[in-house]
A protein has these predicted regions:
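Acidic, small-polar-rich N-terminal luminal/periplasmic segments of exported/outer-membrane proteins
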Residues: 27-162, 485, 509
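Acidic/polar loop-and-plug regions of large Gram-negative outer-membrane beta-barrel proteins
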Residues: 200, 204, 216-285, 300-337, ...
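Outer-membrane beta-barrel translocator/receptor signature
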Residues: 106, 127-130, 141-218, 224-228, ...
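C-terminal beta-signal and adjacent terminal beta-strands/loops
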Residues: 569, 617, 629-637, 656-703
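Face-selective signature of the C-terminal outer-membrane beta-barrel domain
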Residues: 278-300, 328-447
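Structural signature of Gram-negative outer-membrane beta-barrels, strongest in the C-terminal barrel
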Residues: 223-225, 337, 356-368, 410-531, ...
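Membrane-embedded beta-barrel scaffold of Gram-negative outer-membrane proteins
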Residues: 283-297, 301-307, 477-479, 501-584, ...
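Gram-negative outer-membrane beta-barrel transporters
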Residues: 428-430, 528, 546-638, 673-674, ...
Length: 703
C-alpha cells in the first residue's frame, strides 16, 4: 500500500485542491480516479482553484473515507466557517458560510457538477461524491445566484474504463444499518458506466424518530472522439423520516432536558422527500488552447407530510404556566419543485504581447417552479385551550387529531438568464489579476391561489469580481479580492408580498501554501462582508421576514502537516463576528432587534483537530484516527438575545484494518465522552440536541 501517496492526497485536499487524482487505492480501499484529459469543471475554464484569489477548501473522497463520513452535512463540518442551521425538523441540509445563511424556511443551496441543486434534497449521502469544493465569499459574479456566504460545489464520481468497485455494510447502535456500493467498468473502447448508491434503515437517539433513505446515481460516459465527450448522470432520492422539532428549553436551563424526548405524534408518520435529477454534459476540445462546455439539467423534487409541532406563540403555549401541558400545532405540507437549467461556455487562453489572458465566457439559463400547499391547525390566541396539548413526561397518542386548514397555497415561478465573463491576466510570472463580471436578468411571479392575487418582479443584477494573486514562490500564493453577489428570495412575507433579492459585498485577503518543506499545506484568510435583505424565520406563522442588513468579519486558518511519514495532523480554526448592521422590528412578533445583534446559530469560534496514523498491526495495514471538534456558543433565537446555545467539544475515534487485498474492517466511535450538546435551534421550544455516544463497525469488500 502506498502510504506516501495517501498522505500527499490528504495534504493537497486540505490545502486547496487537486486538479487530477492518481489511479491507486487508499489503505481502506477508496477508489481514486483519473480525470478525462478534456474534462473541465463548469465556471472554471483553464484556471485551477489554487490560482484563484479566493479561499477554497476541497474535501476529498479520501477524507470522507478516513473520517467515516456518509452524509454531506457532516462533511461540511470539516471546513472552518461552515456551521449548521435550522434544518426544518431534520429534513434538509442547512448551513451558514462565514455567518451568512439563506432562507431559514428552505434548504441551503449548493451546486452539483456546477448545476444549481434547487428544490428539495433531503439529507444528502456522500456515496456518489468524489470531492466537495467550498469556495468562500459571494460567487455570483461567476456562478450566478447562490448562498451569500460562499459557493459549495459537489463533484460526483465519474465512470472509469477499468473495472473497479466496492460494497460496504455498516452496523451500529440505535439499530443503524447502512449499505453502500460503487461499480464502474467500460462497455466498449469509447463508453464507460458507473452505478453507486446508499441505503439506510436506522433508528436514532430520538424516540420514535427513524430514517429510511435510498440514494442511487447511475452515469454513462461516451468518448465520441479524442476531443469530444458526452456524459449523462442521474440522481434518485427517496427519504422517509418523521419531522422532528427537537426539545424545549425553559429559563435557559440546558441541564434538565430529556434529549431523547419526541413531542410530535407517532401517528403522523414520516415526511417524504423525493427527487429525480438528470444531467447531460458535452465537453469539446476546440484546439490545444480552447474548450467548449455545454450542459443541461432537469430536477424534479417534492416534500410531503404531516407533523405535530410544539406551539411557539406565547399566547397559545401553556408549558410556561403548567409543566404538564405542552401546546402543539398540527401542520400539513405538500411542496413540489421543478428546476430546468442549461449553460454553454467557452474557455481558453491567448497571448497579447507578453501578457497571457485566461478567458472564460458563458451564458446560462434556468426555469424554477415551486408549488406550496401548507395547512396548519392551532388554538386561538390567549384562549387557554388544551386541545391537542400533551403531557411531555407522559404523552398520550390516542387523543383526536385536529385537521389542519389551508394557510398558504401558492404557485411560484423564477426565471433567470445570465451572461458571465472572466479573465485571469498573467502580468508576470508571479503576478496575476482576475477580472470577472456577470449580468443576470431575474423574473419572479407568485400566484396566491387563495386570493387569486399575483405578485411579480423583474430585476437586472450586475455583479463584479476583482482579485490579485502573487506567487511568492512555487509553494506560496498571496491574494486579495473583492466580489459582489445576489440571491433571489423565494416566497411571500406575512403581508403576502414578494421579497427583494439578497445582495452581498465581500473583501478578503489571504495566503495559500502547498507542499512547503514537502510537509506543510494550508491557508489563511481575513474577510469582511455585508449583506442586505437577509431573511430570518417568523416561526409563529412558518413564513420568513426581512432581517435587513447584516455584516460579518473574521479570520480562517487551516494547516495540514506530516509529523512523520505515517502521521498527518490537520488543524482548522475560524473566528466569525456576524451581526445585524441596523435596527429592525420583527414584523410578526413586534420585537425590536437592535443593531449589533448576533445572527442565529453562528458561532464566534470553531475549531477542528484531526490526527491520522498509518501503521501495521499483526502484519496488516492499519489506520488509527482521532478528531476533536469545537463549536462555540450561538444565538438560538432571532427575537431573544438571551437564548444562547452552549459551546461544545466532541472527540471521535476511528480504526481500520486491511484483512487482505479485498476486505477491510473499520470501527468508529463518535462523541466518545457522551457529551450533551445542541446542534442548532429555531426557537427555544424548537432546539435540536446532538447525538450521544454512537459506535459502528463497517466491513468493506472491494473488487
Amino acid at each position: 500500500v502506498n502510504k506516501k501517496l495517501l498522505l500527499s492526497l490528504i495534504l493537497v485536499a486540505n490545502g486547496t485542491t487537486a486538479q487530477e487524482s492518481a489511479s491507486n487505492r487508499s489503505p481502506n480501499g477508496e477508489i481514486e480516479h483519473i480525470e478525462i484529459k478534456q474534462f473541465r469543471q463548469p465556471y472554471r475554464g483553464n484556471v485551477p482553484l489554487v490560482q484563484t484569489p479566493q479561499a477554497v477548501d476541497t474535501i476529498s473522497s479520501e477524507q470522507l473515507e478516513s473520517e467515516s463520513i456518509t452524509r454531506f452535512m457532516e462533511a461540511l463540518e470539516l471546513t472552518p466557517s461552515v456551521v449548521r442551521q435550522n434544518n426544518s425538523g431534520g429534513m434538509f441540509d442547512s448551513f451558514a458560510i462565514r455567518g451568512f445563511s439563506g432562507d431559514e424556511n428552505n434548504p441551503s443551496g449548493y451546486l452539483v457538477n456546477g448545476f444549481n441543486s434547487r428544490g428539495y434534497n433531503g439529507n444528502r449521502s456522500t456515496a456518489n461524491i468524489e470531492s466537495i469544493e467550498v469556495m468562500k465569499g459571494p460567487g455570483s459574479a461567476l456562478y450566478g445566484q447562490g448562498e451569500p456566504g460562499g459557493t459549495i460545489n459537489i463533484i460526483t464520481k465519474k465512470p472509469q474504463f477499468e473495472e473497479q468497485g466496492y460494497i460496504q455494510a455498516t452496523f451500529g447502535n440505535y439499530s443503524k444499518k447502512q449499505f453502500e456500493f460503487d461499480y464502474t467498468n467500460s462497455a466498449s473502447k469509447e463508453t464507460a458506466y458507473r452505478l453507486n448508491g446508499a441505503y439506510e434503515d436506522s433508528d436514532t437517539h430520538r424516540n420514535h424518530v427513524s430514517i429510511n433513505s435510498l440514494h442511487l446515481s447511475p452515469s454513462i460516459l461516451w468518448n465520441i472522439s479524442d476531443d469530444t465527450s458526452l456524459s449523462y448522470e442521474m440522481e434518485v432520492l427517496d427519504q422517509k423520516k418523521p419531522l422532528d422539532r427537537g426539545v424545549y428549553i425553559l429559563n435557559n436551563n440546558f441541564d434538565d432536558v430529556n434529549t431523547d424526548a419526541f413531542y410530535g405524534d407517532i401517528r403522523d408518520g414520516a415526511h417524504q422527500v423525493e427527487a429525480l435529477g438528470h444531467q447531460l454534459v458535452l465537453n469539446h476540445k476546440v484546439s490545444d488552447d480552447w474548450h467548449i462546455l455545454t450542459g443541461f439539467a432537469y430536477r424534479d423534487s417534492s416534500f410531503e407530510g404531516v407533523s405535530s409541532d410544539t406551539e411557539l406563540s406565547d399566547g397559545r403555549q401553556l408549558i410556561y404556566t403548567d409543566a404538564s401541558l405542552l401546546s402543539r400545532q398540527r401542520r400539513a405540507r405538500d411542496y413540489q419543485a421543478l428546476d430546468v437549467s442549461a449553460r454553454i461556455e467557452l474557455s481558453g487562453e491567448i497571448e497579447l504581447g507578453s501578457v497571457k489572458h485566461n478567458i472564460l465566457v458563458g451564458v446560462d439559463h434556468y426555469n424554477f417552479d415551486i408549488d406550496t400547499d401548507y395547512k396548519v391547525w392551532r388554538t386561538a390566541w390567549g384562549s387557554g385551550d388544551t386541545t391537542y396539548s400533551i403531557n411531555p413526561n407522559n404523552p398520550d397518542y390516542t387523543q383526536t387529531q385536529p385537521e389542519p386548514v389551508l394557510k398558504t397555497l401558492t404557485e411560484e415561478n423564477q426565471k433567470g438568464l445570465g451572461i458571465y465573463a472572466q479573465n485571469l491576466i498573467e502580468l508576470t510570472e508571479k503576478s496575476k489579476v482576475l477580472v470577472g463580471v456577470r449580468v443576470d436578468k431575474f423574473e419572479q411571479d407568485i400566484l396566491n391561489l387563495r386570493s387569486d392575487e399575483a405578485q411579480s418582479q423583474e430585476q437586472t443584477e450586475f455583479t463584479p469580481r476583482l482579485g490579485f494573486i502573487y506567487n511568492a514562490n512555487d509553494k506560496v500564493n498571496l491574494y486579495t479580492s473583492y466580489a459582489e453577489g445576489f440571491r433571489p428570495n423565494p416566497g411571500l412575507d406575512s403581508n403576502r408580498n414578494a421579497f427583494e433579492p439578497e445582495e452581498t459585498k465581500s473583501f478578503e485577503i489571504g495566503a495559500k501554501w502547498q507542499g512547503v518543506a514537502d510537509r506543510f499545506s494550508g491557508s489563511i484568510a481575513l474577510f469582511d462582508a455585508q449583506k442586505t435583505n437577509m431573511l430570518t424565520a417568523e416561526p409563529d406563522i412558518g413564513l420568513s421576514a426581512t432581517l435587513g442588513e447584516v455584516e460579518s468579519q473574521g479570520i480562517e486558518f487551516q494547516l495540514t502537516t506530516e509529523l512523520t511519514d505515517e502521521t498527518v495532523l490537520a488543524l482548522a480554526y475560524a473566528y466569525t463576528d456576524a451581526k445585524t448592521a441596523n435596527d429592525v422590528i420583527n414584523a410578526d412578533w413586534g420585537v425590536p432587534i437592535p443593531k449589533g445583534s448576533r445572527l442565529i446559530n453562528v458561532a464566534d469560534h470553531i475549531g477542528h483537530v484531526s490526527l491520522k496514523h498509518y501503521t501495521t498491526l499483526l502484519g496488516k495495514e492499519s489506520y488509527l484516527g482521532a478528531t476533536v471538534n469545537y463549536v462555540g456558543d450561538r444565538l438560538g433565537e432571532t427575537t431573544d438575545a438571551n437564548f444562547i446555545l452552549p459551546s461544545y467539544t466532541l472527540v471521535n475515534l476511528s480504526a481500520s484494518v486491511e484483512l487482505n487485498d479485498k476486505v477491510s474492517v473499520k470501527l468508529d466511535i463518535n462523541n466518545l465522552f457522551d457529551k450533551t450538546y445542541f446542534e442548532n435551534s429555531y426557537h427555544k421550544l424548537w432546539t435540536m440536541p446532538g447525538s450521544p455516544t454512537t459506535y459502528s463497525a463497517s466491513v468493506k469488500y472491494q473488487f
